[in-house]
């Protein structure tokens, strides 16, 4: 949870108000609830040479990418790209979707996602602008995509 909070406070602060950042980073979750929320078909953790966690991501079996966070100290090192690629390799889906922050939208465009629409998310009564983005499977053909889905 520390990496999540630190990333929100240091990276997302340029695109959201101080109040939004405080609510987002301070959103109370029990440690048990946090761990349980990663019980999706694919949850990945990136570590550095010292085995320190520098990023994490998870995706549901329908291709919904729920979370992608990379340590503020490891932004622009390819960690996020490798996590997304690994998720997409492990989850065979005709399309991938994610609700992404204002800050993350340019990154997702670089890995092939397109903006579907602007969205409003809420934590309690605090509103956050984000975007629903999607990407079609880059399977070579429909029969291969169908084979991957079975």
Residue ranges and their predicted role:
Residues 1, 5-32:
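Conserved GNAT-fold acetyl-CoA-binding loop/helix
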Residues 108, 113:
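Conserved active-site tyrosine of GNAT-family acetyltransferases
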Residues 37-38, 57-60, 83-92:
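Alpha-helix C-terminal capping segments
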Residues 103, 126-150:
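Terminal substrate-recognition subdomain of acyl/acetyltransferases
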Residues 39-55, 60:
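Conserved beta-hairpin
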Residues 55-62, 66-71, 77:
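Helix-adjacent hinge/juxtasegments
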Residues 95-99, 114-132:
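Conserved catalytic-core motifs of GNAT/GCN5-like acyltransferases
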């Amino acid at each position: 949870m520390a990496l999540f909070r630190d990333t929100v406070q240091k990276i997302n602060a340029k695109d959201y108000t101080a109040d939004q950042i405080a609510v987002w980073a301070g959103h109370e979750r029990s440690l048990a609830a946090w761990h349980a929320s990663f019980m999706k078909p694919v949850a990945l953790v990136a570590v550095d040479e010292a085995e320190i966690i520098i990023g994490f991501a998870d995706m549901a079996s329908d291709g919904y990418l729920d979370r992608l966070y990379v340590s503020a100290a490891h932004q622009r090192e390819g960690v996020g790209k490798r996590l997304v690629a690994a998720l997409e390799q492990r989850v065979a889906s005709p399309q991938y979707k994610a609700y992404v922050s204002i800050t993350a939208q340019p990154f997702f465009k670089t890995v092939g996602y397109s903006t579907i629409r602007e969205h409003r998310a809420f934590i309690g009564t605090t509103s956050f602008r984000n975007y629903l983005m999607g990407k079609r499977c880059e399977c070579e053909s429909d029969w291969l995509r169908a084979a991957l889905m079975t």
